[in-house]
Amino acid sequence: MNLIEFPLLDQTSSNSVISTTPNDLSNWSRLSSLWPLLYGTSCCFIEFASLIGSRFDFDRYGLVPRSSPRQADLILTAGTVTMKMAPSLVRLYEQMPEPKYVIAMGACTITGGMFSTDSYSTVRGVDKLIPVDVYLPGCPPKPEAVIDALTKLRKKISREIVEDQTLSQNKNRFFTTSHKLYVRRSTHTGTYEQELLYQSPSTLDISSETFFKSKSPVPSYKLVN
């Protein structure tokens, strides 16, 4: 090649050649185009909605919200997760293609929040249902904290290895966190919940004789002391 015909070749060739590995290229493409599935159930999701505006502009991170779990690789849980919603959340996570990531946003998602002390219907930590990659505490977290969590997740993706991802997929990825909880005495001191177990019989279950007998007037001699 004649360098006289291409005098700028030696100056631009060093900037046009990229040397990398397939693993790093895959990580770079995934961290630059995260497609989140927004699972918001409470007030924490309102703070995440602030990122859509022009002040924070979460599009610069390549985030494209999706409405289907089959098209998402990131699920962001924000808010309280109840026992009734737990199977739906696990089903959404299982429908996401690998590799997939989870961000737990807010105190209610991480530990149950103010419902964790004495609630019969609240999941005390979403990591009991699905594995969590980044914990974002707060009540609620600010939009700047959400951006910091996304940055930490991008750094985690950049250090991943394909072989490690394959091994993690074959293992049981649920119940990844063992909480150090202390058993305390229940705060239920009354019997106010027992009345819910008693249901008065309907009029269809009562015979006509018993019904009219109960409706009969009280004799006058029973009114006298």
Curated annotation (Swiss-Prot):
InterPro entries: NADH_UbQ_OxRdtase-like_20kDa, NADH_UQ_OxRdtase_20Kd_su. It is a peripheral membrane protein. Gene3D superfamilies: 3.40.50.12280. It catalyses: a plastoquinone + NADH + (n+1) H(+)(in) = a plastoquinol + NAD(+) + n H(+)(out); a plastoquinone + NADPH + (n+1) H(+)(in) = a plastoquinol + NADP(+) + n H(+)(out). Binds 1 [4Fe-4S] cluster. It holds the Pfam family Oxidored_q6. Its main location: plastid. PROSITE patterns: COMPLEX1_20K. [4Fe-4S] cluster binds at residues 43-44, 108, 139. It comes from the Eukaryota. It is found in: Plastid, Chloroplast thylakoid membrane. GO terms for biological process: aerobic respiration; electron transport coupled proton transport; photosynthesis, light reaction. GO terms for molecular function: 4 iron, 4 sulfur cluster binding; iron ion binding; NADH dehydrogenase (ubiquinone) activity; quinone binding. Its EC number is 7.1.1.-. Keywords: 4Fe-4S, Chloroplast, Iron, Iron-sulfur, Membrane, Metal-binding, NAD, NADP, Plastid, Plastoquinone, Quinone, Thylakoid, Translocase, Transport. One of its GO terms (cellular component) is chloroplast thylakoid membrane. Its cofactor is [4Fe-4S] cluster. NDH shuttles electrons from NAD(P)H:plastoquinone, via FMN and iron-sulfur (Fe-S) centers, to quinones in the photosynthetic chain and possibly in a chloroplast respiratory chain. The immediate electron acceptor for the enzyme in this species is believed to be plastoquinone. Couples the redox reaction to proton translocation, and thus conserves the redox energy in a proton gradient. Belongs to the complex I 20 kDa subunit family. NDH is composed of at least 16 different subunits, 5 of which are encoded in the nucleus. This is NAD(P)H-quinone oxidoreductase subunit K, chloroplastic. It comes from Lolium perenne.
